[in-house]
Amino acid sequence: MAATAVAAAVAGTESAQGPPGPAASLELWLNKATDPSMSEQDWSAIQNFCEQVNTDPNGPTHAPWLLAHKIQSPQEKEALYALTVLEMCMNHCGEKFHSEVAKFRFLNELIKVLSPKYLGSWATGKVKGRVIEILFSWTVWFPEDIKIRDAYQMLKKQGIIKQDPKLPVDKILPPPSPWPKSSIFDADEEKSKLLTRLLKSNHPEDLQAANRLIKNLVKEEQEKSEKVSKRVSAVEEVRSHVKVLQEMLSMYRRPGQAPPDQEALQVVYERCEKLRPTLFRLASDTTDDDDALAEILQANDLLTQGVLLYKQVMEGRVTFGNRVTSSLGDIPVSRVFQNPAGCMKTCPLIDLEVDNGPAQMGTVVPSLLHQDLAALGISDAPVTGMVSGQNCCEEKRNPSSSTLPGGGVQNPSADRNLLDLLSAQPAPCPLNYVSQKSVPKEVPPGTKSSPGWSWEAGPLAPSPSSQNTPLAQVFVPLESVKPSSLPPLIVYDRNGFRILLHFSQTGAPGHPEVQVLLLTMMSTAPQPVWDIMFQVAVPKSMRVKLQPASSSKLPAFSPLMPPAVISQMLLLDNPHKEPIRLRYKLTFNQGGQPFSEVGEVKDFPDLAVLGAA
């Protein structure tokens, strides 16, 4: 048949590659938008489908094939609805969707509806008429799409299309502009004006020049898109590999768990090393986009930290068991990766000062990244004026020391102080307690006047005398917690940011005397919340330990998506069975504004009720 020749001629110009796999969410909205049982088309479903196409990175490539399947439906109403969705997408789904539809691969699917050899023998006249009308309208509205014009002209030559249809004056969907407002043709104002002038000309040489200009612009845009795609792919690969590396290294400190497979760990590490020059090349090629460059540098910081942590572990500076040696304090691997510089950025109870002066140390810390790593105890660069491990939220000051303008500490005994803090010589102190001689310079109100309280910001390194105390060895997985029937306590609830404290049915596994509590943080605010740091204090007759939080940031709330939740375990040892009192300090950033809140959790249930729950 004639249409067969058209399809064969068209297909010969491109690879016969099958359509990509559809996305479930796209199918869901398309099924609603093309439901043949509806008397009228669901325009809200069409709008949601278009939004999903624009949101999903693979939407512009998957959607045309989903639409082609619907257009070829034996049910007339479903096919007509799908053609309406196709027109809507051509108006609202951007250049990438447009380019997919303008390929011969997709145009062949429309030709099949018209060809008696394929579906034309049983497709209704209304469906075939709408397909012809759409193809003709595209040749009018998109003269730069040569493939659409060629396909339409070949159909006319073969007699499939007898004459050009008349476009209805009262068309439901307005004709789209020749290209979107954010199109590549508007990026350069001079080229845009030149192209407009050439397209309006009746001289063949001007039209040829316009065609060459369009091809050059499209080529430039494709090269730009390829760069963006490579950058996004590389950054995503860095994040995924560092996450895997983090999880494998965390096995070294989980009680009773075998170490990770060394061969697999080595493969992940080597891949991380190979990604570093890739990021360097991307950074050198991304000089005109500050946001993209910042994303690459952030990924490089994350990758560098993962590599350094791997080297620390493989050099034997981290031991098997529950605890990491003094090079890492007792900061868990997961916490290190949640917020590489979180201690310095969000914890106002500390003042980590890195001495960059060669006169004091003889070595210069090479970069801010290395300073951050040094503050976490995982850098080989020398650090002074700061503490590690249990002192993440504690500092030891010498009254005679003075701070230099560059942030260093002019203190001749800085090395000695650091050694004192890391050695086992200081007097024993209870787990997670801050010595009253080293009260932080920025303590929540009421703390200095309440010497019976101590502050805890996370799982800190235990002192020598507390190695055998329960909390030093206790770790409760989140999935093992069984919620109690008791209602949760509201810890904080302002500006859409809410923190609840939940109770568990049982104590910590193997340590029934340790009460397990669960903090949950969520946000219904339109702005994201980040750099979240939660600290707690209990009377000295009790002990408390905060396990790492699942995250340090919450996205902006969307009514179309379930709210994100941060979870953090709180372990409480109350050996004297006293009424529970708990104070907290909360710091976070919301909408670009920093917040620092202090309060006390009240209305704890009686111990008898708590134990029976």
Swiss-Prot record:
**Taxonomic classification, please?**
Eukaryota, Metazoa, Chordata, Craniata, Vertebrata
Q: What does the protein in this record do?
A: Plays a role in protein sorting and trafficking between the trans-Golgi network (TGN) and endosomes. Mediates the ARF-dependent recruitment of clathrin to the TGN and binds ubiquitinated proteins and membrane cargo molecules with a cytosolic acidic cluster-dileucine (DXXLL) motif. Mediates export of the GPCR receptor ADRA2B to the cell surface. Regulates retrograde transport of phosphorylated form of BACE1 from endosomes to the trans-Golgi network.
Q: Which residues carry this modification: Phosphoserine?
A: S400
Q: State the residue spans of region: Unstructured hinge.
A: 316-483
Q: What post-translational changes are documented for it?
A: Ubiquitinated.
The family this protein is said to belong to: Belongs to the GGA protein family.
Q: Please list the residue ranges that the record marks as compositionally biased, kind Polar residues.
A: 399-414
Which keywords, in A-to-Z order, does the entry hold?
Endosome, Golgi apparatus, Membrane, Phosphoprotein, Protein transport, Transport, Ubl conjugation
Q: What are the recorded GO MF terms, alphabetically?
A: phosphatidylinositol binding; small GTPase binding; ubiquitin binding
Cross-referenced InterPro entries, in alphabetical order? Clathrin_a/b/g-adaptin_app_Ig, Clathrin_app_Ig-like_sf, ENTH_VHS, GAE_dom, GAT_dom, GAT_sf, GGA1-3, GGA_N-GAT
Q: Where is this region: Disordered?
A: 389-414, 435-466
Protein name as catalogued: ADP-ribosylation factor-binding protein GGA2
Q: How does it sit in the membrane?
A: Peripheral membrane protein
Keyword Aminoacyl-tRNA synthetase listed: no
Q: How does it assemble?
A: Monomer. Interacts with NECAP1, TSG101, UBC and AFTPH/aftiphilin. Interacts with CNST. Interacts with GGA1 and GGA3. Binds to clathrin and activated ARFs, such as ARF1, ARF5 and ARF6. Binds RABEP1 and RABGEF1. Interacts with the type-I membrane proteins LRP3, M6PR/CD-MPR, IGF2R/CI-MPR and BACE1. Interacts (via N-terminal VHS domain) with SORL1/sorLA and SORT1 (via C-terminal cytosolic domain). Binds the accessory proteins CCDC91, P200, SYNRG, EPN4 and NECAP2. Interacts with ADRA2B.
UniProt tissue specificity: Ubiquitously expressed.
**Its GO CC terms?**
clathrin-coated vesicle; early endosome membrane; endosome membrane; Golgi apparatus; trans-Golgi network
